[in-house]
Curated annotation (Swiss-Prot):
This is Glycerol kinase. Pathway: Polyol metabolism; glycerol degradation via glycerol kinase pathway; sn-glycerol 3-phosphate from glycerol: step 1/1. The keyword Kinase applies. The lineage of its organism: Bacteria, Pseudomonadati, Pseudomonadota, Gammaproteobacteria, Lysobacterales. ATP binds at T13, T14, S15, T267, G310, Q314, G411. ADP binds at T13, R17, T267, G310, G411, N415. One of its GO terms (molecular function) is ATP binding.
Length: 499
């Protein structure tokens, strides 16, 4: 049967999605399933790995049934995933020995403090391009081995496996036959040397993580293995692409040339700039990471990770009951007229790039008796744009490249007010693509290249198209005044302490 589609599995922080893409890179079908969040203690975030797999299996079945697609028409599967989230499981039974510790979780912050006190920061920075932070997988694995009885001894015997979510999905989809990850996910573990492209013995010793439990690191676009037949009605489908969610979005946005950048506005906000074959060491609080590895060549990116973006609107909706639904935020923000001097610094789990302060809480500034919920909503939406400017300033400083345009994706960019305000605050055009699901599309492209469904990156780049281009329209003095207010709010937030 002729291959007509590529399937992307997009395993995110709050839901799993399965999506079909045709040869034109258009969405041909989608299914989505949410799963539970576990909060054992303040600042801790965990997932049940079995529940994640159930959500993935369910979406695949729903997608095939709803789209009435014959599995033989699927050329391959691309996987993209929430990065850094760590799973440890028993190789014999396939059962996790603890919950998955999520990228947002701060439960390893004490381990990070100890590593910093021991003087490991520069070594980690030089080898991994990362900072010592609870965000990354390495300290999560150490925490599991430290806290689950007998785990480290079992890991040393080769009885346990570690993986980021991509590894966990592939292990299960192949029936335990394949234990792999790709360069992008490995580069987020704090255990992988992004220059030698190997798991690093010194980093593993620092974390006391046995090498026997680590997955094999492969390229981002190749056939890793075949699915078991029960998931695709008796057919085996090749799993042929892997990328962490933000790198997948960079690929899906066709940012193939050095200096091209994208920003994804989701739960958090993640801005990546392609730096080509050069791993640019950041002096301004950004991360150096692997963009992808294809055809024997690795390319790099600078990244600014903002921990709280769209979730600040969710907080207004669910926590403060100011909104009926998140999509109402555009109307509320426009109705406010301006922010009336109100700033929200959404440091609910500290601040990420370029500040990297896990010890601070969020704050609201500039309240008066005249402050309305519309002002709150506008300040929340504006906070995404201000944080993005913080990151862009650092990115241009590190790279020496002045950004010509920003390709934007993610749920929040559907908000026209947000997109226009972002362009105004950056003084850079913001481009929203026709296909909004760029993360899943990037994974599909990687799998499609490996299976010959698409011939080249040049073919992919021609498919990328703009839905709407937002041009800067704000006076420069107003832009600078608004941003100065934000900077004051951040400075005040970092100076506030609760004993």
């Amino acid at each position: 049967m002729e291959k007509q589609y590529v399937l992307a599995i997009d395993q995110g922080t709050t839901s799993s999605r399965a999506m079909l893409f045709d040869r034109q890179g258009k969405v041909a079908g989608v299914a989505q399933r949410e799963f539970g969040q576990i909060f054992p203690q303040p600042g801790w975030v965990e997932h049940n790995p079995r529940e994640i797999m159930t959500s993935v299996y369910t979406t695949i079945t729903e997608l095939l049934n709803n789209a009435q697609i014959d599995a033989r028409a699927i050329a391959g599967i691309g996987i993209t995933n929430q990065r850094e989230t760590a799973v440890v499981w028993d190789k014999a039974t396939g059962q996790p020995i603890y919950n998955a510790i999520v990228w947002q979780s701060r439960q390893t912050k004490d381990i990070c403090a100890q590593l910093k006190e021991a003087g490991h920061e520069q070594m980690v920075r030089d080898k991994t391009g990362l900072l010592i932070d609870a965000y990354f997988s390495g300290t999560k694995v150490k925490w599991i081995l430290d806290h689950v009885e007998g785990a480290r001894e079992r890991a040393q015997k080769g009885e346990l496996a570690f993986g980021t979510i991509d590894s966990w999905l592939i292990w299960n989809l192949t029936g335990g036959k394949v234990h792999v990850t790709d360069y992008t996910n490995a580069s987020r573990t704090m255990m992988f040397n992004i220059h030698t492209l190997q798991w690093d013995a010194e980093l593993l010793a620092m974390l006391d993580v046995p090498a026997q439990m680590l997955p094999e690191v492969r390229s981002s676009s190749e056939v890793y293995g075949m699915t078991q037949t029960q998931y695709f009605y008796g057919e085996q489908v090749p799993i042929a692409g892997i990328a962490g969610d933000q790198q997948a979005a960079l690929f899906g946005q066709a940012c193939f040339e050095p200096g091209m950048a994208k920003n994804t506005y989701g739960t958090g906000c993640f801005m990546l700039m392609n730096t080509g074959d050069k791993a640019v060491a950041s002096k301004a609080g950004l991360l150096t990471t692997i963009a992808w590895g294809i055809d024997g060549k690795v390319e790099y990116a600078l990244e600014g990770a903002i921990f709280v973006a769209g979730s600040v609107v969710q907080w207004l909706r669910d926590g403060l009951r100011m909104l009926g639904k998140a999509s109402d935020s555009q109307a509320y923000a426009e109705r406010a007229g301006d922010n009336d001097g109100v700033y929200i610094v959404p440091a609910f789990v500290g601040l990420g790039a370029p500040y990297w302060r896990s010890d601070i809480r969020g704050a609201v500034f500039g309240l008066t008796r005249g402050t309305t919920k519309e002002h709150f909503v506008r300040a929340a939406v504006e906070s995404m744009a201000y944080q993005t400017r913080d990151v862009l300033t650092a990115m241009q400083s590190d790279s020496g490249i002045e950004l010509k345009e920003l390709r934007a994706d993610g749920g929040a960019i559907a908000n026209d007010f947000m997109a226009q305000f972002q362009s105004d605050i950056l003084n850079v055009p913001v481009l929203r693509p026709e296909v909004a699901e760029t993360t899943a599309l990037g994974a599909a492209y990687l799998a499609g290249l490996a299976t010959g469904f698409w011939s080249s990156r040049e073919e992919i780049a021609k498919q990328w198209a703009v839905d709407r281009r937002f041009e800067p329209a704000m006076a420069d003095d107003k832009r600078q005044a608004l941003y100065a207010g934000w900077q004051q709010a951040v400075e005040a937030t970092m100076g506030f302490r609760i004993s």
